[in-house]
Each structure stands twice: as C-alpha cells, then as structure tokens.
Amino acid sequence: MSNLVYFSSVSENTHRFVEKLGLPATRIPIHGRIQVDEPYVLVLPTYGGGHANGPDPDRGGYVPKQVIAFLNDEHNRSLIRGVIAAGNTNFGAEFGYAGVIVSRKCGVPFLYRFELMGTTDDVFAVRQGLTDFWADARKDQTCHQPSQLQNL
C-alpha cells in the first residue's frame, strides 16, 4: 500500500515531485471533485507564505481551496493517514505550513516537507519513509483486527 493523493497548481511543482517518486498517485483536479476509496497520504503545496509575524493559522490561505473541498468530503477525510507538504524556504516558519494545518485538523502525522519540486534526497527520503509508514500501518492494522483476535 503506497497510495498518494496530491494537489498541484498550474506551476506543476508538486506534480513533478510526485512523478519523481514513481508511486501510484491520484491528483486532486484544479476544477471538479474526486472521491477516494483507499487510505492515502496527502501531498500538497503551501500557499500564501511570507507574513512578517510568522504563521497565523487563523488567517487561512495556506491550504489550497481544492484540497479544502476534497477534505470537506467526510469519506475522503476518513481515509487520510498522513500529510507531506511542499513549500518555499523563503517563507521561513511558514515553509510547508499547509502540512501543519492539515495534520492538526485531520489528526494525522505531518510526515515530511520539501522545497518546490524537491531534491533527489527528498525523493529518496519520501520513498523510504512511505515504505516504512505503510509497513507500520499494516502491522498496526493486523494487530487490531477484531475478526483475527476472536479466532485466538
């Protein structure tokens, strides 16, 4: 299991990063809606950085509207397992801040952040991190399935 769901704006930076990963991925469209049917890790860009006083989660604007609409679907939100955010280090503390917001609001781990299209090191780190993440998730799921426990 290595499902990714991602959003990329017309800049295509996040799309390029996801392509480099070489993993199964579903793109949230710029126009229109989708629904997913399997657990996934969300990859998204961060918008609107560069505020003089640092991150302000009450201000909004960090998470793309398309991602908000996707996560406002209760079914989609129920399947998110983690988040990875893209950003720009020029924005200081707001670098990858969309990941912080989604992590807090959805109660999932913020797994990684990368700059713009990511580096080769980012690609390797995310690939390995996702392999480990899904292996741990499968192990946890195996240990907690009631049907298997009833047979013991």
From Swiss-Prot:
Q: Name the Gene Ontology biological process terms.
A: protein modification process
**Domain of life of the source:** Bacteria
Matches recorded under SUPFAM superfamilies? Flavoproteins
- Which is one GO molecular function term here? FMN binding
Q: Which InterPro entries match?
A: Flavoprotein-like_sf, RNR_Ib_NrdI_bac, RNR_NrdI
Family matches, as PANTHER family: PROTEIN NRDI
The job of this chain, per UniProt, is described as:
Probably involved in ribonucleotide reductase function.
Q: Which HAMAP family match?
A: NrdI (MF_00128)
Write out the similarity annotation.
Belongs to the NrdI family.
Output this protein's name. Answer: Protein NrdI
Q: Which gene encodes it?
A: nrdI
